[in-house]
Amino acid sequence: DDIKLSQQYDVLDLFKYMHQ
């Protein structure tokens, strides 16, 4: 499940990057 959390964070980072 830890990987799932990491993946979610990765998506969030990607979203932030796209929004930048």
UniProtKB/Swiss-Prot annotation:
Domain of life: Eukaryota
Bridged cysteine pairs (disulfide): none
CC terms in the record's Gene Ontology section: plasma membrane
Subcellular location: Cell membrane
GO molecular function (one): G protein-coupled receptor activity
Similarity-based family: Belongs to the G-protein coupled receptor 1 family.
Function, in words: Putative receptor for octopamine. Octopamine (OA) is a neurotransmitter, neurohormone, and neuromodulator in invertebrates. The activity of this receptor is mediated by G proteins which activate adenylyl cyclase.
Protein name: Octopamine receptor
Species whose genome carries this gene: Photinus pyralis
Classification of source organism: Eukaryota, Metazoa, Ecdysozoa, Arthropoda, Hexapoda
